[in-house]
Amino acid sequence: MANTKYYPEVSSNANFAAIEREILKFWQDNNIFQKSIDGRNGESEFIFYDGPPFANGLPHYGHLLTGFIKDVYARYQTVKGKKVERRFGWDCHGLPAEMQSEKELGISGRLAITNFGIEKFNAHCRASVMEYASDWEEYVTRQARWVDFKNSYKTMDKNFMESVLWAFKELYNKGLLCESMRVVPYSWACETPLSNFETRLDNSYRERSDKAVTVSFVLRDKLHEIPAFAGMISRESEMTVGGDYQEYRILTWTTTPWTLPSNLAIAVGSDIDYALVPQENICYIIAASSVSKYAKELGLSGEENFEIIKGSQLQGLRYKPLFDYFEHHPNSFKIFDVDFVVEGDGTGVVHMAPGFGEDDQILCESKGISLVCPVDNSGKFTKEIPDLEGVQVFDANDKIIIKLKEQGNWLKTEQYIHNYPHCWRTDTPLIYKAVPSWYVKVTQFKDRMVELNQQINWIPHHVKDNLFGKWLENARDWSISRNRFWGTPLPVWKSDDPKYPRIDVYGSIEELEKDFGVKVTDLHRPFIDKLTRPNPNDPTGKSTMRRIEDVFDCWFESGSMPYGQAHYPFENKEWFEDHFPADFIVEYSAQTRGWFYTLMVLSTALFDRPPFLNCICHGVILDATGQKLSKRLNNYADPLELFDQYGSDALRVTMLSSNIVKGQELLIDKDGKMVFDTLRLFIKPIWSSYHFFTMYANADSLKGEISFASENVLDVYILSKLKIAVSKIEESLDNFDTQTAYHAVLEFFEVLNNWYIRRSRARFWKSEKDTDKQNAYNTLYSCLKTMAIAMSALVPMISEAIYKGLCHCEETSTLSSRDLIAGSSKSINNLNPVVKPRDYTPSVHHNDQISVHLCNYPTLSDFEINHELVATMDNVLDICSNSLFIRSTKNIRVRQPLASITIISKHNNDLKAFENLIKDEINVKSVIYCDDLENYASKKLSINFPMLGKRLPAKMKEIIAASKKGDWKAIAGGLTICGETLNNEEYKLILEPYSHIKGAASFENNSSLLILDLELTAELIEEGYARDIVRFIQQARKDAGFSITDRILIEIISEFDLSEIIYNYGDFITEQTLGEFSKNFTPDYVSKVELEDHPIQLKIKKS
């Protein structure tokens, strides 16, 4: 009669991609995601905001990384008993959609769009923005991320847009909006301004080489004729160089020659020293520190002495404009001393073009100089510069330089390499240009944002006061209007007659319908533009209220996501107030200038609250050489192919166990080796323990039960380690630290596989089904089932497969041959999936859930950790692992016995209880105990230079010297050196054996030492051979396909004399292999091996 098998038969070489496909189908067929939400009563919720991506392109690795993090914490909080709604969202408006549509329609520029028709253009945008929505759903689903796609919000939905209108009017009513003409970063390729924070996104600064030009402006005023200079410049000093200067010229340097036609002022540094450099009848004015750079151009030998003046003495001097375009502009063409001009590059003199520089505009406005901006929306000169009309500004540089040479104002041209901002959509260089725009007056409440930021837990922590905190401290007013087409229109109507000014701002569809008397079904352009009405302030009745053409910056919409998704305040008011702020959000670190920032601005201005309480800023993924992942470079694999080869759990672990979750970079290779290594080193060890349990439990027809009652020392130890791991995972995920959580999982399974299972093999293998054997199965079952729940958020599909196999095997279906073929063809190892044995009886417990993701997080509250046992057994493990490492470095195989190990420790009495275990594990004959550590080793101080160097940079030389001399003293909780107290993270004490001690290693945090006796006697060598023979026979049994319980006949044929070995160790060999030596039988299997380079033929047969 066949054995009853309670668990599925699983391969040790499983096809994890095929298993994952089965799990995805199981989730879908059984509606597990929805059950995970419905199963929580909502009294305790975890509020999660899902930042909306654009759907006009496929997801990339950055999206997958963010999605993995989002999914981990949503799943974790669910098993912790909280209700976690996960509504997906889509960014639909803005430049990404417009640029894509222009490309698809074959048009470019505002004029072309207007001629094409705004209605048709926006209709195309509407259709195209969701082009890849189904692909997104495929990717997101395949990565095992649970989100609600059916109820997703879209920023182009009327309800969402209406909430945006409400927010705008609220800001307007609070006095936090203004319309202003300001210099802002401007994309001439997109014909729209950008926010200052958009120039900080996605590494938008690029290295660029520009022509820098030095030009001379002729002063209208001669210095020696000005009373202020009379006592400083003597007539005699002038006469020594040829008499009165005919001209004074001030030298300026700029990397944007195209702005020179718009020059209206010059700025010098108040406290900078300027030299008066004579050349024939001309006296040049230049920063004294820059004179040497222009020696050639000014004809200097380097030996000259010059008169020096302060920049403040140049204040108010007049100069002649370079060009006559704006020569009559009021209050212009004067020198002003300021504090923002610095020495360094250039001449220490800055030309001011208030239409193209923020500082320029501020200075000129303060001096009563209005700006000029002779550049149109496409970055081309207007008719105000007639000889350059229609020329793109960057193409005009050479023409301007030629003209300067002709006029005699040119001095020098050089190539200047610098980091320059580029458009984040078109990658074209930006210009800074004065444009009319609506602004959120961020500067009025930025101090409050800084205060509210202190309520947010940032991961990594330094983001709070550095990356994000500094950005808030220096926040500027936010330009939120864009002169584009596809976006939420600004709800501002103005009178078309300046004689009768009026501005109306609308915050709801109801207000619009009331004033304009029409039903509003679409808030987009051009429909909203058609809403006009007579100006109530015009008694003549001739003027009309018309909407301004601008639409919102799409970042305003992203920042409106918390209330926009709920159509607040028009609906769901109570829901929103209960779901704001979010408990958690996550994006990559550049979003401190993007989504995180816009959320913070609007949340502070509208609600005086932080928008979220916990935020992870992860790093970026690069290729193996450190380059950005790019289709053009073809330097990354399709994620779906990676999933089909290794499974998505492996990619999840690869990413979330790395430093990228702490804001650092992750380099990932195109061939997937890193993911394969994760599969090999993380996923497979977990599966191996599960495979071991099912294989032997089925062989013994035994069921495991959740039990913590065993008193076996190995059981108590592993169950204690289990509770420690479960607690560590919980603590780590509570602190938003996946890296530590994954380490806790890996560390536990290393101990489970390499210690508990290996040291308990005899208990599983023995034929008696006694209490000890059942305890071993119960303990292993308890570990696997408990860890499946604890790590379910970290490896959701492998956890589900293990949990179902242990608890709900009746629902584990056999994979179809089609699945097997598909999986095998894409798998590097032709791996096998989970299959169900024919004589299979499911093991179901009354308190089991249908899915691991419907369980509650394990507490193990009834089990007390045996801390003393854990500490001692950890030391035993440390001793054994170090001993095996020494063997490895000395090329001494583990089967080769050694005479002894010497242990020098304060805890020898505790270790003696495990002496036999140590002897067996590391294969030594005896254990010698000592406590006189100083006779064997000394402690050396190792400094953590990066950490201590930041705190004590000036003392590092002295500390290094003292550490080498041993001039330090250990104290409670630290160490003193050179008058400084170091904490435990700033140093490490390393136990260093004396040079004559061989085979030594430290353990127990460098407080204890072990020494292996590496001398091999003839007797030890012979016993080693016997153990080799056992291994050869065991391998032959496995290769022959024998069962672990089959007894066998053995014959060994060799020219190498094995008689002494068989005589002395024959009983040991047969006992270990369930065999007996025999001759003259027909073997079932023959194996050929080598022992010390001697060929051996090994014959075995079932007896």
Curated annotation (Swiss-Prot):
Record carries keyword Plastid: no
Essential cofactor(s): Zn(2+)
Gene3D superfamilies hit by this protein: HUPs, Isoleucyl-tRNA Synthetase, Domain 1
UniProt free text on domains: IleRS has two distinct active sites: one for aminoacylation and one for editing. The misactivated valine is translocated from the active site to the editing site, which sterically excludes the correctly activated isoleucine. The single editing site contains two valyl binding pockets, one specific for each substrate (Val-AMP or Val-tRNA(Ile)).
Designated name of the protein: Isoleucine--tRNA ligase
Catalytic activity: tRNA(Ile) + L-isoleucine + ATP = L-isoleucyl-tRNA(Ile) + AMP + diphosphate
Subunit structure, interactors included: Monomer.
Listed InterPro entries: aa-tRNA-synth_I_CS (IPR001412), aa-tRNA-synth_Ia (IPR002300), Anticodon_Ile_ABEc (IPR033709), Ile-tRNA-ligase (IPR002301), Ile-tRNA-ligase_type2 (IPR023586), M/V/L/I-tRNA-synth_anticd-bd (IPR013155), Rossmann-like_a/b/a_fold (IPR014729), RPE4 (IPR022439)
Domain of life: Bacteria
PANTHER family the record matches: ISOLEUCINE--TRNA LIGASE, CYTOPLASMIC, SOLEUCYL-TRNA SYNTHETASE
Record EC number: 6.1.1.5
GO MF entries: aminoacyl-tRNA deacylase activity; ATP binding; isoleucine-tRNA ligase activity; tRNA binding; zinc ion binding
GO biological process, one term: isoleucyl-tRNA aminoacylation
Cellular component GO terms held in the UniProt record: cytoplasm
Keyword Transferase: no
Motif ('HIGH' region): 53-63
Location(s) in or outside the cell: Cytoplasm
Residue interval(s) of motif 'KMSKS' region: 628-632
Binding residues for ATP: K631
PROSITE patterns (alphabetical): AA_TRNA_LIGASE_I
Pfam families linked: Anticodon_1, DUF5915, tRNA-synt_1
Job of this protein: Catalyzes the attachment of isoleucine to tRNA(Ile). As IleRS can inadvertently accommodate and process structurally similar amino acids such as valine, to avoid such errors it has two additional distinct tRNA(Ile)-dependent editing activities. One activity is designated as 'pretransfer' editing and involves the hydrolysis of activated Val-AMP. The other activity is designated 'posttransfer' editing and involves deacylation of mischarged Val-tRNA(Ile).
Organism field: Rickettsia akari (strain Hartford)
Keywords annotated in UniProt: Aminoacyl-tRNA synthetase, ATP-binding, Cytoplasm, Ligase, Metal-binding, Nucleotide-binding, Protein biosynthesis, Zinc
Family recorded in the similarity comment: Belongs to the class-I aminoacyl-tRNA synthetase family. IleS type 2 subfamily.
